[in-house]
Amino acid sequence: MYKRQTYGWAWQNTYYTYGYLAGTIEATSLMADPVIEPENYNDAAAVNTARKADDYTAPASPESAEDYPDIVLILSESFYDFDLVTDLQADTDIMPVTKNLPNSVYGHTISPHVGGGTNSTEYEMLTSNSLILMPSITPFNWLNLYNANSVVSYLKGLGYSTMAAHPYTNSNYRRDSAWLALGFDETHFQSDFTTQETYGDRPYQTDSATYRDWETMYEAMPEDKPRFSFLVSIQSHGDYDMNDASLDIVHAATDYGDYDALMDEYLSCIKMTDAAVQELCDYFTAQYEKTGRKVIVAMAGDHAPSFVGHVADPSFAETDNELQILERSTPFFIWANYPLEHTAAATSTTDPLNRMDMVMLTPTLLQQAGLPLSDYYEYLLEMKHNTPVVTAANDYMKVDGSTAEYGADPALDEWAKGYLMLEYNNIGAHAKRDQSIFDPAE
């Protein structure tokens, strides 16, 4: 479907693996055109593909504009559930809140990478463009994001005010310029998070403190518009050998050998993330009671911690590829401070892990919020009922959770190829974008 490239999310690895000459040639090529053109692409075929979105049936009529809820989207650093790949036993329940939120959808999104690549996940979450067509880049560092279609531009088109925040340096992945290029009305970084609460010797602000500081920013947004706020957390970033063992609040009973200490510190971080979710939900519940503002929240992990491959049990999957999919499956939830009436539309009846590609999370969130949907978003939602995950490894996941290679099922191939056609029409250098595919339906 497309040619392979060598440049990964860590550019140093390319030079180490393939040598200076190959790395430099690849980098030069990517600077000229970082997006791979699908085989047999043409603009007319892309427009025709968008018509498949006509098959999508919304679970309910969209809300009227005055009833649009505030939208909160959180990318949670290294948020992962080791129950997916190992028989984890511990002295306490690690995610009692997240896995049992009332009035919510719970499942797993598939991260582009195992154990790293936050910006790749961030880009897929915000734009619903898959890294399949650009597997060798860090998006914010390579792509021109001005006038790019994203959930930011989409919600601004519906009248939303927009804000993005991250309690760490603004230079990571060029977020300071990338977020402004995407159109966020305001951005906040480390100096705006004044609580500066950390966990032991770890240098990263806790999720609890991050949410408290961010709530102040949220309340300062315009009151006369619906609000969209995007938050990238930092608390659970590696490494996981920074604290003295006496500070661990979770202790794994399972023997992980050399990774015992890392696992305890990591799980302690996840336990704290889970507790902070309850604090955030309590805050928005109180806000609804106080102001009547409706808020819907989606949160997903960006990737598993880097050591996941060292402790994963191969017997948890039938094939190596399915094990890698599990290692890339990060938890997500969608919750609201008002009744969600159509959670069944976002819940798989055949995959107990309720998995979807990261590019499908935002369309699913907007669906649950009752907002008008573009043809692009509708295509992804309809595609989710056929092949919920497509990967850069030339395979995809079926609705029952099993995987297959491209070419094995022509009907599923058509969905995947159609999606890549639409994506290239959106961002490809040799495509003439049909903006009507990506704008809200009239």
Walk through the language-model features, giving the residues of each.
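Solvent-exposed soluble domains appended to multi-pass membrane proteins
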Residues: A45-P69, L73-S76, D81-E442
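Conserved small/polar residues in nucleotide/adenosyl-binding loops
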Residues: M1-Q5
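Long, acidic (Asp/Glu-rich), low-complexity accessory segments flanking structured domains
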Residues: T6-A10
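Helix-hairpin-helix/helix-loop-helix acidic hairpins
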Residues: W11-E66
